[in-house]
Structure formats: structure tokens, C-alpha cells
């Protein structure tokens, strides 16, 4: 389309030049009646015509360059569209929300760690020794050897394989963001299990003891887990949406559930 416009402009310019040349020819005929006085005028006309010819040639060269550049521009546009398509496909499998696990850990835990570290230096050495003996008797051996919780995200194919009734209004981004939350809950519990009593406040120590009782059960040994009461967001909460997400993840083999005492325990599972 740009080539057509340039060609149309060139035709208009040539027509204008032809009209001007015709007028100049008429002037030449009129001035031939006085040859001696028209020589300077003819020289000026020749110079003007030469300048016009150069301008026309310059326009033609520019038009040719633009025409030759069109195929290259088309190839570049096609390559850009292909790359855009690849990036869009990749973005489908990536969750839109990647929360920092460190910020997801219980804020009370972090605050109490700092407070209790300061108090350690004020405690009597004999009392510290007794507390370490008490801790050694309480801590289970299972607290060692755990790595970071796994992040087994679901794919769009897995989500589409679910019935519309089970899937509801859930999206790939919501479910994978919930998987991030579950890993954060499990990591926070692992910190509580591994922390010493001196670094925990009384309320957190009670939860740590409860988790250490749970971790000795055969169903959760060596696995990452969290409690139903840990579900406090930002993406996975104990509401209807959260329960629907758990149902989907349980169906897709990402979690299993068990009840230990009065606690409903959700265990992170590797998909088959």
C-alpha cells in the first residue's frame, strides 16, 4: 500500500514537471523573437530542468530502496509473531503469582526468634543445660534430612481433563498460586519442627510440640505437610474456593489427606 501511494505521488510530480516543461517551451518560443536577450534565461531554464531531473531520480532511488525493504520487514514481522506465539504458550504453564517463601513464614515465628535470641544471653548456664536436656528428650529424629517443599504445578491439560463441575471457576493461575502457598505452609512447619525451644515463644512451642507428634506418624514420615488450620492465604484459604482447590489437587495426585488426632493433615505428594 505504501508503494502504491509513493507511485501515485511520483506520477503527480511527473505530471507537474511535464506541465512546467510545456510552459517553458512556450516561453522559449516567445523569447526566440529576441535571441540575444534570451540566452541568460535559457541557461537558467536549463539549470532548473537539470535540478528537477536530479530530484526525480532521487525520488525514484528512494522508492526503490523502500520497495526492496518491504520483504525484509515482512519476514521480521512473521518472526516476531512466531516468537509472540511461543511466549504466549509458555505463559500458560507459568503461574502468575510467585510469593517469596521467606515472607510467607509465620511473622510471629520470626519476631519470637529475635526476642528469644536476646534472652538466651541472660539465662543461667545450669538452666540452659536443663532445657537442652528437655529438648533432646522431646525432639523426634524425623526433623533432619528434609529439603525444601516441592512445587509440582499442574498443567493446562490436567486442568482441562477435569469435569466442568469439579473445575468450576478455577483457573490455572489460581491453582498454581495455591501450590505456592501450600509449599510455604509446609516450609513454615518444617522450621517449627527443627527450631529449638529457646528460639520459640510459648504459643509457637505448643504448636511445634503438636507438629513433632504428628511427624512421628507413619503416614507423614519423611514428607512435607501442613494442617488445615494453616490455610490463611493469600491464595489458599479455608473457604469454598480453597476447598475446591484441595479437591482438584487431591484428584490430580498433588496432595493426600489424613486425620491425626484432632488435626486434618494435608500431605504434599509427587504426581504419578
UniProtKB/Swiss-Prot annotation:
A single MF term (Gene Ontology): microtubule binding
Keywords: Coiled coil
GO BP annotation list: attachment of mitotic spindle microtubules to kinetochore; cell division
Disulfide-linked positions: none
UniProt entry tagged with the keyword Coiled coil: yes
UniProt family annotation: Belongs to the SKA1 family.
Entry protein name: SKA complex subunit 1 homolog
Source organism (scientific name): Arabidopsis thaliana (Mouse-ear cress)
